Amino acid sequence: MDQNNSLPPYAQGLASPQGAMTPGIPIFSPMMPYGTGLTPQPIQNTNSLSILEEQQRQQQQQQQQQQQQQQQQQQQAAVAAVQQSTSQQATQGPSGQTPQLFHSQTLTTAPLPGTTPLYPSPMTPMTPITPATPASESSGIVPQLQNIVSTVNLGCKLDLKTIALRARNAEYNPKRFAAVIMRIREPRTTALIFSSGKMVCTGAKSEEQSRLAARKYARVVQKLGFPAKFLDFKIQNMVGSCDVKFPIRLEGLVLTHQQFSSYEPELFPGLIYRMIKPRIVLLIFVSGKVVLTGAKVRAEIYEAFENIYPILKGFRKTT
């Protein structure tokens, strides 16, 4: 019998030269590296995948934060530009004119989520306006003149000691004040007479009374032997007052019109409002009393009150 046929069936493939290369039966030799002929399988590391996903997520968050910061900067720049233009209009007025009156006008800006508004309450910018209706039509209040200050030149040098000794109702103390203080009863006024010949008359309630009183003082000086004249009579200041009949929130008024007003209750109980046109100074009290001073003519007193009355109504105190 043949030798190949005597081998068992499981060893027949090993005896033949082709059997050594039979697929499905791997042969390992000492000269062949371990793993030769094997198909490598890809290995996936779950830890490396999670790290990549975390990095991508952080990059996306950083991009979103940068976009939000850019939007905030753009909106802040736009609001700053609006605020600057508003302040320029408040100081210059329309078409380069000086504003006559100012009141509060809220500027609405939509803040970004999570940000604080740029305008803290109650600070609001100011824009010039003109009242739509005169105060005389809506209130019927007419300021009353309380004092008129006028000046006149007597045109000669005066001996104040002689005037004080010979004239009635006259006093002179050069250590305290270098002028003769003279008073008359009708109209009830007071005059300050200086040695240069200048005279100041105060206390009159009207323009006619002020002129009449100044002429009476000049006549007294003439009777004392001085060549007094009546030159350059001029009204220097008029003071008026009125009552609006309702209390006023002075704190809100000074915050809204802080460019033109000052309020120090520890020093003076009234709010001082300096109007630009007409150039009048107003003393506003919480009780509703208003004093107007600095006018040269009566019409300026009335015009200033017409301008301020609508503002005072806006700050009426509710009880």
Curated annotation (Swiss-Prot):
This is TATA-box-binding protein. It holds the Pfam family TBP. DNA binds at N147, R183, K198, N237, R274. The gene is TBP. HAMAP family: TATA_bind_prot_arch. One of its GO terms (cellular component) is transcription factor TFIID complex. The keyword Ligase does not apply. Keywords: DNA-binding, Nucleus, Repeat, Transcription. Belongs to the TBP family. It is found in: Nucleus. Coiled coil: none annotated. Residues 107-118, 126-136 have a biased composition (Low complexity). GO terms for biological process: DNA-templated transcription initiation; transcription by RNA polymerase II; transcription by RNA polymerase III. General transcription factor that functions at the core of the DNA-binding multiprotein factor TFIID. Binding of TFIID to the TATA box is the initial transcriptional step of the pre-initiation complex (PIC), playing a role in the activation of eukaryotic genes transcribed by RNA polymerase II. Component of a BRF2-containing transcription factor complex that regulates transcription mediated by RNA polymerase III. Component of the transcription factor SL1/TIF-IB complex, which is involved in the assembly of the PIC (pre-initiation complex) during RNA polymerase I-dependent transcription. Binds DNA as monomer. Belongs to the TFIID complex together with the TBP-associated factors (TAFs). Part of a TFIID-containing RNA polymerase II pre-initiation complex that is composed of TBP and at least GTF2A1, GTF2A2, GTF2E1, GTF2E2, GTF2F1, GTF2H2, GTF2H3, GTF2H4, GTF2H5, GTF2B, TCEA1, ERCC2, ERCC3, TAF1, TAF2, TAF3, TAF4, TAF5, TAF6, TAF7, TAF8, TAF9, TAF10, TAF11, TAF12 and TAF13. Component of the transcription factor SL1/TIF-IB complex, composed of TBP and at least TAF1A, TAF1B, TAF1C and TAF1D. Association of TBP to form either TFIID or SL1/TIF-IB appears to be mutually exclusive. Residues 1-21, 107-139 are annotated as: Disordered. It comes from Bos taurus (Bovine). GO terms for molecular function: RNA polymerase I core promoter sequence-specific DNA binding; RNA polymerase II general transcription initiation factor activity; RNA polymerase III general transcription initiation factor activity. InterPro entries: TBP (IPR000814), TBP_CS (IPR030491), TBP_dom_sf (IPR012295), TBP_eukaryotic (IPR033710).
